[in-house]
UniProtKB/Swiss-Prot annotation:
Gene Ontology CC annotations of this record: cytoplasm; nucleus
Quaternary structure, from the entry: May be a component of the multisynthetase complex (MSC), a large multi-subunit complex which contains at least eight different aminoacyl-tRNA synthetases plus three auxillary subunits AIMP1, AIMP2 and EEF1E1. Interacts with the MSC components EPRS1, AIMP1, AIMP2 and KARS1.
Species for this entry: Mus musculus
Annotated region (Disordered), positions in chain: 80-117
Tissue-specific expression: Ubiquitous (at protein level). Strongly expressed in muscle (at protein level). Moderately expressed in heart and liver (at protein level). Weakly expressed in stomach, kidney, testis, spleen, brain, fat and lung (at protein level).
Entry EC number(s): 6.1.1.3
Family (UniProt): Belongs to the class-II aminoacyl-tRNA synthetase family.
Biological role stated in the UniProt entry: Catalyzes the attachment of threonine to tRNA(Thr) in a two-step reaction: threonine is first activated by ATP to form Thr-AMP and then transferred to the acceptor end of tRNA(Thr). Also edits incorrectly charged tRNA(Thr) via its editing domain, at the post-transfer stage.
Protein name per its UniProtKB record: Threonine--tRNA ligase 2, cytoplasmic
Enzyme class: ligase
Length: 790
């Protein structure tokens, strides 16, 4: 043991000397780079050589760190073993026996935290060793010819001086205002998200992001996920997997052997999270070699998989808060106390990376905010959303249902089918105005089609496949490959471009059973899918047409929307000149369209840039439904060509993938919740209710209902003798009939009806012919407020 201690001391001493050399060399490289900006001759001559020296020393240091950690771990293990042997020969004291009994009693109590797993202690020991012996950033030590003064410009504000490797964004913020520093969630340094307590490394532009910023929210919820992860480790003792921020909150997945999470345990987890928050545990960042992290997380096969499969660099980062140390790129808030309000509200089961053949994981969801008022507003919002839940409305209004014998495939009842068909009729009318041609394509294809399109290699697990006469077939999950066959079935000329194919074909996707959720996530659905085959020079005009199309549809529904242009990603296919031209035309289309839009650099698909559209519903939620996506790759894969003006028959078209509703099922869910079940007349599954004042008028009521039905309205008659007239009217209003037509002897004589609305606005006696004519005009115009416009 003494020999190992001496070896560890020698390695540590050598490591310290080399780290001093690295600090000096790093500072020298930075100085030379700064000089290069002012006078490039010297910086160009010496910079590369010194950079290579730094890299060589750092590589050697990584090896030394691993040796040092190994030596110290073995040394610590030997000490624990010897201490254990010594303790085994000592009889327990009376107090120790009492403590042991108390611990056992505590662990046996239901709802109490389990004993802290052994791996937590071992993980912490290694982290502390690494933290002591391997500081992430060079210390600020004065060296010959080293200038540590840096310029820090606060975005939109003043410029201050700082010290390299020492000044932090938090100090910069505090220098402006303590209140500003306390309310800042995260910093952005030279365009990169940065921990507030992480020292700056050179001249910097610093942005200070508050919670109202989307990136800051993601960081805030990511830090909250770490708090939840710490609580889950303490409570369940399982192995953590992924814990990301999501659109509204966060979750953490955990593998727990032989048990599942119960919703009754969520309040206990929430209390542990609140304790962690009170402790104000700092978030500590450390960059560590991949090999050392494999040793640190050897107890957790999921973290080891991430390291082996996802990390392609020699080092990566971990973050610590309290006893939790987690693989994480960060950044994070300063400490757990920054989370002022937290709620753990839901749990479910899932699979490792969504693969049903892999391990089952327990997923727990949470939400957090920087003040309690925001939490109360969120809870109020959840109650409102719950009352508008499309599954609740679908059941109450008898629109649709699901059955275990066909999970993920909706059964639309007559009134739900009316809404479905009304939406498709609306889009068909728009197709006719905009020169789209509707086509019908097969539901199943040989797998060779999907191999050609590239979907088989990347998407086959999400397809329903089966064997037919020794060949593999699949139900189509999208229409585009079939439309490529339709375009290619005969020669095409520039004269017929653009070709616009529209298809309401049935699509199937093999979604995991645990992800199915009402109409928003299904296995069987239809889209208002269209593919435009056009020449490159036609892109701008076609995109403008798509934008006006979606504006027309969304304004009819009463939706506002956001536009985002996603441009060329780092890894893309195709010629850069074509990408540049396509992006230029997309930008021109957006500018001419005249609505606000943002750019998402590098967020396009690998096969083409796109415009993402999010609609905003009545309670402020955003939903992505429409898609406008350019595709340069499918025309190549299917060898699509057209004959140009000069007779060249090898010209490639560009494909524009375009959907407005997206999935019709999902749009019905969104519309149900947006309207809260109060459908506008043209979409309403209950448009007219006819109510006779007594038995003598029932035949006339049936006649009025028949006339309405023959004109295309969803009309019903209430002939229930057990209800009073007022009760019948109230029932019709609660059932959301847009118009209630009351008929008595007077109306019967005058061939009229007495009109009132579901909001009890009384329009009085009107002839049945006039009522039907007005209703037809209101339905045709697709007005949102037919009851007011009547």
């Amino acid at each position: 043991m003494a020999a190992q201690a001496l070896a560890a001391q020698a390695v540590a001493s050598r490591l310290q000397r080399q780290e001093e050399d690295i600090r000096w060399l790093c500072a020298e490289v930075q100085r030379l780079r700064d000089e290069q900006l002012r006078g490039p001759e010297r910086g160009q001559a010496e910079g590369p050589r010194l950079t290579r020296e730094v890299a060589q020393l750092q590589a050697e240091n990584r090896d030394l760190h691993q040796r040092l950690c190994g030596l110290r771990l073995r040394l610590a293990e030997q000490r624990r073993t010897e201490a254990g042997r010594a303790a085994a020969h000592e009889p327990p004291t009376q107090n120790q026996e009492k403590d042991t009994k108390k611990k056992r009693l505590k662990q046996s109590e239901p709802g109490r935290e389990v004993k802290q797993p052994n791996f937590i202690k071992e993980r912490l020991q290694l982290f502390e060793t690494l933290k002591t012996d391997h500081q992430l950033l060079p210390a600020t030590q004065e060296k010959k010819n080293t200038n540590n003064v840096i310029s820090v410009r606060v975005a939109g504000g003043k410029t201050v001086q700082g010290e390299r490797w020492k000044t932090t964004p938090y100090q910069v913020a505090a220098g402006i205002s303590k209140e500003l520093a306390e309310h800042t969630v995260i910093a952005k340094v030279n365009g990169v998200l940065w921990d507030l307590d992480r020292p700056l490394e050179g001249d910097s532009t610093v942005e200070l992001l508050m919670f109202d910023n989307e990136e800051a929210q993601a960081v805030y919820w990511h830090s909250s996920a770490h708090i939840l992860g710490e609580a889950m480790e303490l409570y369940y003792g399982g192995h953590l997997c992924y814990g990301p921020p999501i659109e509204n909150g966060f979750y953490y997945d955990m593998f727990i052997e032989d048990r599942v999470v119960s919703s009754t345990e969520l309040s206990a987890l929430e209390n542990i999270c609140k304790t962690i928050i009170k402790e104000k545990q700092p978030f500590e960042r450390l960059e560590v070699s991949k090999d050392t992290l494999l040793e640190m997380f050897k107890y957790n096969k999921f973290k080891c998989r991430i390291l082996k499969e996802k990390v392609d660099t020699p080092t990566t980062t971990v973050y610590r808060c309290g006893p939790l140390i987690d693989l994480c790129k960060g950044p994070h808030v300063r400490h757990t106390g920054k989370i002022k309000a937290i709620k753990i509200f839901k749990n479910s089961s899932t699979y490792w990376e969504g693969n049903p053949e892999m391990e089952t994981l327990q997923r727990i969801y949470g939400i957090s905010f920087p003040d309690s008022k925001m939490m109360k507003d969120w809870e109020k919002f959840q109650e409102e959303a719950k009352s508008r839940d499309h599954r609740k409305i679908g059941k109450e209004q008898e629109l649709f249902f699901f059955h275990d014998l066909s999970p993920g495939s909706c059964f639309f009842l007559p009134r739900g089918a009316f809404i479905y068909n009304a939406l498709m009729d609306f889009i068909r009318e728009e197709y006719h105005k905009r020169n789209f041609t509707e086509v019908l394509s097969p539901n199943m294809y040989n797998s060779k089609l999907w191999e050609t399109s590239g979907h088989w290699q990347h998407y086959s697990n999400n397809m329903f496949t089966f064997d037919v006469e020794k060949d593999t077939f699949a139900l189509k999950p999208m229409n585009c490959p079939g439309h490529c066959l339709m375009f290619a079935h005969r020669p095409r000329s520039w004269r017929e471009m653009p070709v616009r194919f529209a298809d309401f074909g049935v699509l199937h996707r093999n979604e995991l059973s645990g992800t199915l959720s009402g109409l928003t996530r299904v296995r069987r659905f239809q889209q208002d899918d269209a593919h435009i085959f056009c020449m490159v020079e036609q892109i701008e005009e076609e995109i403008k047409g798509c934008l006006h199309f979606l504006q027309s549809v969304y304004s009819t529904f009463g939706f506002s929307f956001q536009l985002n242009l996603s441009t060329r990603p780092e890894h893309f296919l195709g010629e850069i000149e074509i990408w540049d031209e396509a992006e230029r035309q997309l930008q021109n289309s957006l500018v001419e369209f005249g609505k606000p839009w943002k750019i998402n650099p590098g967020d396009g698909a690998f096969y083409g840039p796109k415009i993402d559209i999010k609609i905003k519903d009545a309670i402020g939620r955003y939903h992505q439904c429409a898609t406008i996506q350019l595709d340069f790759q499918l025309p190549i894969r299917f060898n699509l060509t057209y004959v140009s003006k000069d007779g060249d028959d090898k010209n490639r078209p560009v494909i524009i993938h375009r959907a407005i509703l997206g999935s019709v099922e999902r749009m019905i869910a969104i519309l149900s919740e947006n309207y809260g079940g109060k459908w506008p007349l043209w979409l309403s599954p209950r448009q007219v209710m006819v109510i006779p004042v007594g038995p003598a008028c029932e035949n006339y009521a049936l006649q009025v209902s028949k006339e309405c039905f023959e004109e295309g309205f969803m009309a019903d008659v209430d002939l229930d003798d057990s209800c009073t007239l007022n009760k019948k009217i109230r029932n019709a209003q609660l059932a959301q009939y847009n118009f209630i037509l009351v008929v008595g002897e007077k109306e019967k004589i005058n061939n009229a009806v007495n009109v009132r609305t579901r909001d009890n606005k009384i329009h009085g006696e009107i002839s049945i012919a006039s009522v039907i004519e007005k209703l037809k005009n209101l339905k045709k115009s697709r007005t949102l407020n037919a009851e007011e416009d009547f």
